[in-house]
Amino acid sequence: MNVFRILGDLSHLLAMILLLVKIWRSKSCAGISGKSQILFALVFTTRYLDLFSNFISIYNTVMKVVFLLCAYVTVYMIYWKFRKTFDIENDTFRLEFLLVPVTGLSFLVNYSYTPMEVLWTFSIYLESVAILPQLFMISKTGEAETITTHYLFFLGLYRLLYLANWIRRYQTENFYDQISVVSGVVQTIFYCDFFYLYVTKVLKGKKLSLPVPV
């Protein structure tokens, strides 16, 4: 396990913690897409079904458990604990537009037709597009709170670091996972515009705002 993998995991974990802290401290989930969080919870659930049957390392197991807990606690806070603050009017992305093609693709393009492998592939494809409801929500409202932009930045950084991890593994281990790499590139592309706005606005102390579609 190389440094890019570890830094990627830490960036991912930091993003999730930032989101949880934001919701808990403000007692509000305004500006957060519950649909994206449901998709992320589904990603971790389908990816980590081998949690108790395939031991790799203590680090790997602990991270799986932590990611699952963070994902489901986030969903709980959005849809139960602070549901009165949930911005349902703007969280309107149609999940079937993602779930249907992702499900179909996971059956068509995978490494083997076993239930665990198909579900793992499904989780990889779904993660690459799970952030779209959140980005759609931001484009619809025209702005995002600073803490939300930090959350998105560290999610995007996690993906960039994982791309570096795969490059490093190819160089040192001659290992190449086409499904993960292609999906990771697609996911990173979705963050490109956001990265630009983050650097030019948020890091300069300005609020991230976008033109509201008519």
Swiss-Prot record:
Region (Interaction with the K-D-E-L motif on target proteins): 47-48, 159-169
Domain of life: Eukaryota
Cytoplasmic side: 25-32, 80-92, 136-149, 200-214
Family the entry assigns: Belongs to the ERD2 family.
Protein transport recorded as keyword: yes
Compartment list: Endoplasmic reticulum membrane; Golgi apparatus membrane; Cytoplasmic vesicle, COPI-coated vesicle membrane
Lumenal side of membrane: 1-4, 53-58, 111-116, 169-178
Site (Interaction with the K-D-E-L motif on target proteins): R5, E117
Alphabetized UniProt keyword annotations: Cytoplasmic vesicle, Endoplasmic reticulum, ER-Golgi transport, Golgi apparatus, Membrane, Protein transport, Receptor, Transmembrane, Transmembrane helix, Transport
Biological-process GO terms, alphabetical: protein retention in ER lumen; protein transport; retrograde vesicle-mediated transport, Golgi to endoplasmic reticulum
PROSITE patterns given in the database record: ER_LUMEN_RECEPTOR_1, ER_LUMEN_RECEPTOR_2
Pfam families documented for this protein: ER_lumen_recept
Membrane-crossing residue ranges in chain numbering: 5-24, 33-52, 59-79, 93-110, 117-135, 150-168, 179-199
Gene Ontology MF terms in the entry: KDEL sequence binding
Chain positions of site Important for recycling of cargo proteins with the sequence motif K-D-E-L from the Golgi to the endoplasmic reticulum: D193
Disulfide bonds: none
Protein's membrane topology: Multi-pass membrane protein
GO cellular component terms, A-Z: COPI-coated vesicle membrane; endoplasmic reticulum membrane; Golgi membrane
Region (Important for recycling of cargo proteins with the sequence motif K-D-E-L from the Golgi to the endoplasmic reticulum): 204-207
Function (record text): Receptor for the C-terminal sequence motif K-D-E-L that is present on endoplasmic reticulum resident proteins and that mediates their recycling from the Golgi back to the endoplasmic reticulum.
Domain free text: Binds the C-terminal sequence motif K-D-E-L in a hydrophilic cavity between the transmembrane domains. This triggers a conformation change that exposes a Lys-rich patch on the cytosolic surface of the protein. This patch mediates recycling from the Golgi to the endoplasmic reticulum, probably via COPI vesicles.
Main location: endoplasmic reticulum
Protein name: ER lumen protein-retaining receptor 3
